[in-house]
């Protein structure tokens, strides 16, 4: 994706209500900043990582969709796991919103984390040591698909 002053984040906002930057994630040592940029029509989402010392930006992953890229319903559901050289990506590529694990170096899919006729609403917490993800989802349980439940995988 070439530089373009009209590019936006996937949320259309640069900062949240509390002033925090959206669609960004710092490494623990603040040496790297992961961020998502999007085309204005939101048909393209692009994960990139900037080196905070040099300013160099590495292209990590790009998803193109026919309609509108959505990174989650209540939050941006992507994470870079700098310690394990992986990243979690949210996609509706199977017509449902699910999360996928990719290798950060090779950019190859390692694992489909969630599947089924339901959707992940929000990644709540990732325990890197136990390799567990806590997330909310809708439509997984019988009954009202709008009821949201907390899960661990």
Could you say what each language-model-derived stretch is?
Residues 1-21, 50-76, 102-127, 139-140, ...:
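Multi-bladed beta-propeller domains
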Residues 16-17, 42-44, 98:
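Short catalytic/ligand-binding loop motif for oxyanion handling, primarily in non-cytosolic enzymes
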Residues 71, 97-98, 137, 148-149:
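Low-complexity, flexible helical/coil segments
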């Amino acid at each position: 994706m070439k530089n373009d002053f009209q590019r936006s984040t996937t949320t259309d906002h640069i900062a949240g209500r509390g002033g925090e930057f959206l669609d960004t994630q710092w490494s623990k040592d603040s040496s790297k900043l992961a961020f998502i940029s999007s085309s204005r029509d939101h048909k393209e989402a692009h994960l990139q990582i900037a080196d905070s010392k040099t300013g160099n930006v590495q292209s990590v992953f790009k998803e193109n969709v026919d309609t509108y890229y959505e990174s989650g319903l209540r939050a941006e559901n992507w994470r870079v796991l700098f310690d394990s050289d992986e990243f979690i990506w949210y996609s509706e590529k199977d017509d449902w919103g699910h999360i996928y694990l990719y290798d950060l170096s090779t950019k190859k899919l390692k694992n489909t984390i969630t599947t089924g006729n339901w959707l992940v609403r929000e990644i709540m917490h990732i325990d890197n040591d136990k390799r567990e993800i806590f997330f909310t989802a809708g439509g997984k349980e019988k009954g009202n698909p709008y009821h949201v439940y907390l899960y661990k995988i």
